[in-house]
Amino acid sequence: MKPLILFYNADEGKINKMRPVLALMGIGIKIVGEEQLFNSVGFTAYPEEYENNPEAPSDVPRPDFEFMLLCGMDQKNMNLVLDFMKKNKHNIAVKAMLTDTNKDWSFIRLLNEINAERKMMAQQIK
């Protein structure tokens, strides 16, 4: 699997500033649009490798935060990406990795699970 980052609801300017460096690192970029939210996460990242088991579209809330999903990366590449982003102030607060657990979820489910975790953690901090 080629390393890849999926972006959802992220600022195009940020993505365009990161694009050349990510390309030099051999990391691809995909923008996840509204029409892909009900596709499985694995299929959205790697359609040639994963089967799609889409959910029926629904009125599930669409989170409004910027999100990036790191796919097919080892620890070294992930750290390089995160360090580059931090040094260059390309902040995307919500990040996750493609895992064996979430690869079969719909993208919208992943976003809403992460959003629920964020809210729960914020409550615990208070």
PLM region descriptions:
Residues 37-69:
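Short, intrinsically disordered low-complexity segments
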